Each structure stands twice: as structure tokens, then as C-alpha cells.
């Protein structure tokens, strides 16, 4: 059984080494909640550098590109070893989507088999996570992989509230006498790793394909997302 498992790993590794993966790190200069967050210091390094270094250490990533409208972000990213592309203003304003930035990057580089999106706000996602997600892609013969983590609290304990705060019907009857540990596990997107076949991504304009998409499960600690000053 161990021999079969090792052969499978070798086959996966061999297949993936023949595929090309373009890692894209989108980093706008403007951030409403936390200005300049992508280059704020985190343990002695700019926030974005954690994602750049993780991608560069990956066994499978062919090229790492930072897309930004901001010269300082681009200069810092280049110093940490990433290729850079200047994003035009219309693709970096509040109405522009992440896909707009991805499409702009794809159009300006040679063709790659897969796109790997790495948000710079996930500094604890490292090369091990990236490589495991890519290996899962081949293991599942998937078109797309998206990272998730287990939720801190079950959504079954939550609900909306009316203006007067009335809690009638707040919880479903079937969970009223259940312990938390007896409830099904729920998972949430953690924003750390998105992978998709390039053709499928361009066709669907999203990593969330209708079929043949699987979750890569990460631990909650590695899923930390930097969004506000308190997160630092």
C-alpha cells in the first residue's frame, strides 16, 4: 500500500512539473479600511512580501506577478523577486473586480496552464499550502481548487434580527438541545489560495466553476486575513 502511495505521489509530481502555473498577487494602492495595508510592516517585512516569498518557494509556480496601480508597491514587490505589472486606473478603482486584474495580467504574459491567485492579505499561507493545493488539483483531476477553513462558530447558532431585537424563531428547533460538538462542521472561504485552469477561468470569469471544483482545507491559524489594524 505504501509503495502504491509513493508511486502515486511520484506520478502527481511528474505531471505537475510539466504544467505551468502563473501566480498572481493583486495589490491595489488604495485601501479604505487600512490605508497602504499591502506594504505595512508585519514582523519586519512588508505584508505583500510574505505572499511573494511563499510563491517563489513553491515547487510548482513558474512565475510570480504582482499587479498594482501603485509604484511603491510595484518597487517593493520587484525587490522581493516578483515580476510586476502596472495596472491602469480603471482596473484599480472601487468598481473594478479581481478578475479584471487577473485578465489584464494574463493578457500581458505568455500563456500558462493554470492561474494561482494569492491575496496579499493572507501572510500565514506558505509554500506548503500552495503546493498541497496544487497537488490536490491533480489528485482530484479538478479544474479548480479553492482554499477554505473550518468556521470558528457554527452558522446554525446565528440568524438575522428584526429592528426590535425579537428573537422568536432565532434558532431552528432541531438544534436547540444540541451540543456544539455534535453539529456538522461548516467551512468558509479563507481567501488564501485560488487555482484554476486558465481557459476555464477566462471562460467563466470566476474561480467558482459550476463543476469539478474542490476545497483545499487549511487550519484556522494559517487562514488569518489582514483587513484592519487590529489584525496586525
What is each residue range found by the language model?
Residues 20-67:
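N-terminal glycine-rich phosphate-binding loop and ensuing alpha1 helix
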Residues 65, 71-116, 124-128, 132:
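Short phosphate-binding loop-to-helix
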Residues 68-69, 125, 195-197, 218, ...:
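A conserved hydrophobic position in a structured secondary element of the catalytic/binding core
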Residues 95-100, 114, 123-211:
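Conserved core of the sugar-phosphate nucleotidyltransferase
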Residues 122, 193, 215, 223-224:
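A residue-level structural signature of the nucleotidyltransferase/glycosyltransferase Rossmann-like core
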Residues 205-216, 221-223:
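Catalytic donor-sugar/metal-binding loop of nucleotide-sugar-dependent glycosyltransferases
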Amino acid at each position: 500500500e505504501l509503495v502504491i502511495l509513493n508511486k502515486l505521489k511520484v506520478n502527481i509530481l511528474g505531471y505537475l512539473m510539466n504544467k505551468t502555473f502563473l501566480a498572481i498577487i493583486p495589490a491595489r494602492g488604495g485601501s479604505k479600511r487600512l490605508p497602504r495595508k499591502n506594504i505595512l510592516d508585519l514582523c519586519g517585512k512588508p505584508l505583500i512580501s510574505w505572499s511573494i516569498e511563499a510563491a517563489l518557494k513553491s515547487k510548482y509556480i513558474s512565475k510570480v506577478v504582482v499587479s498594482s496601480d501603485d509604484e511603491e508597491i510595484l518597487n517593493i514587490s520587484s525587490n522581493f523577486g516578483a515580476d510586476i505589472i502596472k495596472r491602469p486606473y480603471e482596473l484599480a478603482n472601487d468598481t473594478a473586480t479581481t478578475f479584471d486584474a487577473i485578465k489584464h495580467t494574463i493578457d500581458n504574459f505568455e500563456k500558462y496552464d493554470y492561474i494561482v491567485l494569492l491575496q496579499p492579505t493572507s501572510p500565514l499561507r506558505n509554500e506548503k499550502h500552495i503546493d498541497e493545493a496544487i497537488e490536490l488539483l491533480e489528485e482530484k483531476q479538478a479544474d479548480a481548487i479553492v482554499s477554505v477553513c473550518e468556521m470558528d462558530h457554527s452558522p446554525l447558532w446565528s440568524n438575522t434580527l428584526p429592528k426590535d431585537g425579537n428573537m422568536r424563531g432565532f434558532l431552528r428547533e432541531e438544534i436547540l438541545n444540541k451540543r456544539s460538538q455534535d453539529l456538522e462542521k461548516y467551512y468558509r472561504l479563507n481567501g488564501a489560495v485560488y487555482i484554476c485552469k486558465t481557459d476555464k477561468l477566462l471562460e467563466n470569469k470566476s474561480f467558482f466553476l459550476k463543476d469539478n471544483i474542490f476545497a483545499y482545507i487549511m487550519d484556522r491559524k494559517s487562514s488569518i486575513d489582514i483587513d484592519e489594524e487590529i489584525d496586525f
